[in-house]
Each structure stands twice: as C-alpha cells, then as structure tokens.
Amino acid sequence: MAEVLDPQHPVARRLRPGERIQAYIPVAATDIVVTDQRVAISDEERLALDIEIAALRRIEFDIERDRPATLVIVPDHALDEPQVLAIPHDQLPAVAEALVYIGQQLYLEGLPG
C-alpha cells in the first residue's frame, strides 16, 4: 500500500523523517493521504486537514448504489475542520483499504501497554 508523493505536494513537505505513506488517493481536485502517523486532506495549494491518526474522533463512510460515496472525517479538536468528500465508485477499494489501516491503528493505540 506504500505510495510515493511528488516532493512539492503539500503533504510531502510536512512528512517527518521515517514517516511512511500508506495510502495516496486522488479524488477530484482533492487528495487523501494516510501515513503511518497521520491523515491529511489537501488540494494542490493547501492542507485542509493534517492530523495525527490518534486525533480522529470519527470517520463515516456512506455508500449508496447510484451516487458517489460520502466520506466524513471528524477530528477530535474543534479547531480542525471536519472534511466531507464525495468518493467515486472507482475509488471505493482504495478508500476502504485506507480505512482498514486507520481502524487498525486506532485499535492498537487503545491497547494497554
């Protein structure tokens, strides 16, 4: 699932040393980027959201038969604006795989020890 971003991409410029990209999903004029540490939503110009996976409050993924799916990402902190994205049917597998990764990370972070 590891991907490579253009070095000029808004997310690429903020990656920490050793941080690995788990998913890069272009959706219309927006990109969804999931690393081993964070979730970011960006366009060519700016980051609309850039938060640690642990700072996620909720993710909703609604799939309908005849419409694009809706992905809602809600951060814990009110200062981070929730993101609502229309996901075309051809991107469902990539988004689902990214959500599985995020879910596993959230679970592992909640384990004692």
What are these regions (language model features)?
Residues M1-I32:
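Anionic N-terminal interaction surfaces
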Residues I63, P75-H77, G103-L106:
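Generic hydrophobic/packing signal
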Residues Q8, Q22, Q37, Q83, ...:
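Residue-identity detector for glutamine
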Residues I21-P68, P82:
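Phosphoinositide-binding peripheral membrane targeting modules
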Residues I59-E60, D76, P112:
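Solvent-exposed, non-transmembrane amphipathic alpha-helical segments
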Residues P75-A98:
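Canonical phosphoinositide-binding patch of PH/PH-like domains
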Residues D90-G113:
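Terminal and domain-flanking low-complexity segments
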